[in-house]
From Swiss-Prot:
Native source species: Podocoryna carnea
A Pfam family matched in the record: Ribosomal_S11
PROSITE patterns: RIBOSOMAL_S11
Protein family (similarity comment): Belongs to the universal ribosomal protein uS11 family.
Gene Ontology cellular component annotations, sorted alphabetically: ribonucleoprotein complex; ribosome
One of the protein's GO biological processes: translation
Alphabetized SUPFAM superfamilies for the sequence: Translational machinery components (SSF53137)
Alphabetized UniProt keyword annotations: Ribonucleoprotein, Ribosomal protein
GO terms, molecular function: structural constituent of ribosome
Protein known as: Small ribosomal subunit protein uS11
Keyword Transmembrane in record: no
HAMAP family the UniProt entry points to: Ribosomal_uS11 (MF_01310)
């Protein structure tokens, strides 16, 4: 079918961090990696954290629910995010790694390490790596009851 007359295809507008950056200078963003045991989020923002540049989860990359938190899904998500960052002009990332935290587990899920590795392997420079898992100072009672979880 021929394209309609008078209807020009829309051109996708690409934001660039162009002229204000010198050659060879790194443009930083912040990669917030949230790795629970059910899913892995890779969310890149600007340095202030207000403007989202890309956000991809493990669940967006695989079909089976059980694979959402897998290292493979996290790797695919991180590769997608890296491609989007390069389009915009971000060349380096500070990484903020987070587990579920609070009164739940403080250990990052299986996708955390592979997401970080995939970002580095896809050409992004890594600045600082910081653990921002929420640590309770005093909180509500943990799940499991008085005698704890019986295995």
């Amino acid at each position: 079918m021929a394209p309609r007359k008078g209807k020009a295809p829309k051109e996708e507008q690409v934001i660039s961090l162009g002229p204000q950056v010198a050659d060879g200078e790194n443009v930083f963003g912040v990669a917030h990696i949230f790795a629970s045991f059910n899913d892995t989020f890779v969310h890149v923002t600007d340095l202030s954290g207000k403007e989202t540049i890309a956000r991809v989860t493990g669940g967006m990359k695989v079909k089976a629910d059980r694979d959402e938190s897998s290292p493979y899904a996290a790797m695919l998500a991180a590769q997608d995010v890296a491609v989007r960052c390069k389009e915009i002009g971000i060349t380096a990332l500070h990484v903020k790694l987070r587990a579920t935290g609070g009164n739940r587990t403080k250990t990052p899920g299986p996708g955390a390490q592979s997401a970080l590795r995939a970002l580095a392997r896809s050409g992004m420079k890594i600045g600082r790596i910081e653990d921002v898992t929420p640590i309770p100072s005093d909180c509500t009672r943990r799940k499991g009851g008085r005698r704890g979880r019986r295995l």
